[in-house]
C-alpha cells in the first residue's frame, strides 16, 4: 500500500516510521529545511530526536507529490497536522487539485474560532472527500517511534476507510480497533487534553493520588456529557479514545498538557511555559472552545471551567481547586 503522511511533527513522524515498516510511505512537511534534515539523517531532530527512522521512509516538501502518492488506487492519506493548521492544509490540498480518495486524520481538538471538530472542517473544505475517518487513542509519539505496544481506534462511517486504515496500521506493536462514532472519538481526544491540565495542576500542588483519581473520574463524566450532547455515544467514552486517552494524558510524564498543569502549579506564566515547551499543547488551544460548547448546550463542566479560569482569567491554581471543593454536594 502507498501511504502519504501530511505533517512531520512528532506524531506524524512516529506514524510514518511505523507505516514505512510495511508500506511505501512518504512523509511531507512544508518546511524544506526540516525535510532536508530528515533526508540527510533519517531522524527528526526537531520534533522526535533520538528516534531512528526506517531507511525505506521517503520525504518530500512538495505537497503535490505527496498528494499524488496518497491518491493512488491502493493508497491512504494520513493528515497529521494540528487542528489549528487543518483548514489551511485542506485549502492547499484543494488548490493542488489532488484530493486523495481515502483520508484519515490524527489531530485532536476543536478549531479555536469556529469550535468545529476536525471532521466538520474537512467536510466544509473538502466536500467531495467521502471515505474518511479519525485515528485516535492513548498514544505518545515517542513510544510509537520506539515500537512499543499501542492500541488505537479508527472511527469512520465508511467501511472502506476503516478497512484501509486497519490494513495500513495494524502490524508490529500497533493494534487497531474499528468503530463508526466519529464525533465521540473526536470529542474524547479534545476534552482529555483540557482535563490533563487539571490533573497536572493537582499533582503539581501535591494534592495526592486521591485528588488525581477524582479529577480523572469526574472529568470523564464531563467529557461524556458534552460528547453525547454533540452526537457521540456514551459507550465511546469508556473506551480507548475516551477513558484510555484520558488516563494516559493525565498521568504520563510525556504529556505536554500535563506538563502545562504542573508548571502552572509551580507559578510559571502560561506564555513562559508554552515558549519553553516548543510543541503544541492542544488543551490550551481548545479549552475555551470546550467551555463555550458546554455553555451553549447548558452542560455543567466545572473542571473545564476551572482550567479556563487558571489559563485565561488569572485565577491562582490553588484557588481554582478550592472553588471545585466548595461546590454544592450532589448525586453522582
Swiss-Prot record:
**Catalysed reactions listed for this entry:** sn-glycerol 3-phosphate + NAD(+) = dihydroxyacetone phosphate + NADH + H(+); sn-glycerol 3-phosphate + NADP(+) = dihydroxyacetone phosphate + NADPH + H(+)
| EC class | oxidoreductase
Note the PROSITE patterns from the entry.
Answer: NAD_G3PDH
Query: Where does the chain cross the membrane?
Result: none
Would the keyword Transmembrane be found if you checked this record's keyword annotation? no
Cellular component terms per the entry's GO annotation = cytosol
Give the EC number(s) under which this enzyme is classified.
Answer: 1.1.1.94
Localized where?
Cytoplasm
**UniProt keyword terms in alphabetical order:** Cytoplasm, Lipid biosynthesis, Lipid metabolism, NAD, NADP, Nucleotide-binding, Oxidoreductase, Phospholipid biosynthesis, Phospholipid metabolism
Q: Which GO biological-process labels does this protein carry?
A: carbohydrate metabolic process; glycerol-3-phosphate biosynthetic process; glycerol-3-phosphate catabolic process; glycerophospholipid metabolic process; phospholipid biosynthetic process
**Record Pfam families:** NAD_Gly3P_dh_C (PF07479), NAD_Gly3P_dh_N (PF01210)
* Binding positions for sn-glycerol 3-phosphate per the UniProt entry: 108, 137, 139, 192, 245, 255-257
Q: Which Gene3D superfamilies match?
A: N-(1-d-carboxylethyl)-l-norvaline Dehydrogenase, domain 2, NAD(P)-binding Rossmann-like Domain
Q: What is its main location?
A: cytoplasm
Listed binding positions for NADPH are 11, 30, 108, 141, 256, 280, 282
Identify the pathway.
Answer: Membrane lipid metabolism; glycerophospholipid metabolism
Q: What does this protein do?
A: Catalyzes the reduction of the glycolytic intermediate dihydroxyacetone phosphate (DHAP) to sn-glycerol 3-phosphate (G3P), the key precursor for phospholipid synthesis.
- Enumerate the PANTHER family for this protein: GLYCEROL-3-PHOSPHATE DEHYDROGENASE, GLYCEROL-3-PHOSPHATE DEHYDROGENASE [NAD(+)] 2, CHLOROPLASTIC
Q: Which family does it belong to?
A: Belongs to the NAD-dependent glycerol-3-phosphate dehydrogenase family.
Spell out the NCBIfam families in the cross-references: PRK00094.1-2, PRK00094.1-4
Q: What is this protein called?
A: Glycerol-3-phosphate dehydrogenase [NAD(P)+]
Q: Which organism is it from?
A: Burkholderia cenocepacia (strain HI2424)
Q: What is the lineage of its organism?
A: Bacteria, Pseudomonadati, Pseudomonadota, Betaproteobacteria, Burkholderiales
Amino acid at each position: 500500500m502507498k501511504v502519504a503522511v501530511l505533517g512531520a511533527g512528532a506524531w506524524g513522524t512516529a506514524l510514518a516510521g511505523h507505516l514505512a515498516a510495511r508500506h511505501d510511505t512518504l512523509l511531507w512537511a512544508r518546511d524544506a529545511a526540516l525535510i532536508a534534515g530528515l533526508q540527510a539523517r533519517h531522524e527528526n531532530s526537531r520534533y522526535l530526536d533520538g528516534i531512528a527512522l526506517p531507511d525505506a521512509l521517503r520525504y518530500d516538501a512538495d505537497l503535490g507529490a505527496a498528494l499524488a502518492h496518497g491518491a493512488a488506487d491502493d493508497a491512504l492519506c494520513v493528515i497529521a497536522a494540528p487542528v489549528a493548521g487543518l483548514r489551511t492544509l485542506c485549502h492547499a490540498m484543494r488548490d493542488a487539485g489532488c484530493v486523495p480518495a481515502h483520508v484519515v486524520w490524527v489531530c485532536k481538538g476543536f478549531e479555536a474560532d469556529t469550535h468545529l471538530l476536525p471532521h466538520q472542517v474537512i467536510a466544509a473544505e473538502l466536500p467531495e472527500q467521502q471515505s474518511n475517518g479519525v485515528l485516535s487513542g492513548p498514544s505518545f509519539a515517542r513510544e510509537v517511534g520506539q515500537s512499543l505496544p499501542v492500541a488505537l481506534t479508527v472511527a469512520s462511517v465508511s467501511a472502506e476507510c476503516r478497512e484501509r486504515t486497519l490494513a495500513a496500521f495494524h502490524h508490529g506493536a500497533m493494534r487497531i480497533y474499528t468503530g463508526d462514532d466519529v464525533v465521540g472519538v473526536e470529542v474524547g481526544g479534545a476534552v482529555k487534553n483540557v482535563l490533563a491540565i487539571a490533573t497536572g495542576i493537582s499533582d503539581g500542588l501535591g494534592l495526592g493520588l486521591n485528588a488525581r483519581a477524582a479529577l480523572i473520574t469526574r472529568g470523564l463524566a464531563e467529557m461524556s456529557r458534552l460528547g453525547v450532547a454533540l452526537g457521540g455515544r456514551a459507550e465511546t467514552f469508556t473506551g480507548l479514545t475516551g477513558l484510555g486517552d484520558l488516563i494516559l494524558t493525565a498521568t504520563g510524564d510525556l504529556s505536554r498538557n500535563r506538563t502545562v498543569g504542573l508548571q502552572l502549579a509551580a507559578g510559571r506564566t502560561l506564555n513562559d511555559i508554552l515558549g519553553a515547551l516548543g510543541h503544541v499543547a492542544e488543551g490550551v488551544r481548545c479549552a475555551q472552545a470546550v467551555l463555550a460548547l458546554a455553555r451553549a448546550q447548558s452542560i455543567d463542566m466545572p473542571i473545564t471551567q476551572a482550567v479556563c479560569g487558571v489559563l485565561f482569567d488569572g485565577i491562582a491554581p490553588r484557588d481554582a481547586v478550592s472553588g471545585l471543593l466548595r461546590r454544592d454536594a450532589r448525586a453522582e
